[in-house]
Amino acid sequence: MSQADLLDQDPVFQLKGSMLAVTILELAHNDLARLERQLADKVAQAPNFFRDTPLVMALDKLPEGEGRLDLPALLEVCRRHGLRTLAIRAGREEDIAAAQALDLPVLPPSGARERPLDIKDSAPRKPAEEPSPSAGEARPEPAKAEEKPAEPVSRPTKVVKTPVRGGMQIYAAGGDLIVLAAVSPGAELLADGNIHVYGPMRGRALAGVKGDATARIFCQQLAAELVSIAGNYKVAEDLRRSPQWGKAVHVSLSGDVLNITRL
């Protein structure tokens, strides 16, 4: 076997699944001038959050009758404010065609991935008929299955005992995340369930990243760059206005509003 053959057998890449936190900008109106002004206000509040932020542009909630969307101009508005569009989420043919012309990936509309199963099977077989009882013969009543109460679903918990340094990202897939030390600025905590930080929380904490609105965040000292539950977030500039800044807090979601209460 030649050296070239040996090199061909040595893989040069791997395909891996990953759960990444990506911001979704859900466009509510086709008004780029107003979008520019409102984005500028947001960037002024949290410039670090918007610097080179990966983004999915959601166009599937745009109301009908607002005219054709200028997608290249929309992407340029986002680019000027530090948002890097990775893909769009759209359902209208004209938006999909515009994205394809820009070689931009298109994701299905919100909820389109969850469809009822289309079972194309033959008609169900009829159960075999039981012989009818003879006259005077009592038919035995079928025994009732004993109903057992549903067991509570336990979620796996990931426990981190060492400080989480800036630049580190820790993700608890399918469950809760518990950190028994400090979380530095620039660090990122993600969990499908709840997040508990038994120390100063100075980085980012994103709970319920797969959409669990019942997820909570608990920390001993709120000094976070960002807290988020099911995609609803507050950045440091918003958090500092809270009287709970620097204190032990509990963060929960009510509708689309984050509530921060003292522990």
From Swiss-Prot:
Residues 107-159 are annotated as: Disordered. It holds the Pfam family MinC_C. One of its GO terms (biological process) is regulation of cell division. Residues 112-129, 138-150 have a biased composition (Basic and acidic residues). Keywords: Cell cycle, Cell division, Septation. The keyword NAD does not apply. Interacts with MinD and FtsZ. Belongs to the MinC family. Cell division inhibitor that blocks the formation of polar Z ring septums. Rapidly oscillates between the poles of the cell to destabilize FtsZ filaments that have formed before they mature into polar Z rings. Prevents FtsZ polymerization. This is Probable septum site-determining protein MinC. It comes from Pseudomonas aeruginosa (strain ATCC 15692 / DSM 22644 / CIP 104116 / JCM 14847 / LMG 12228 / 1C / PRS 101 / PAO1).
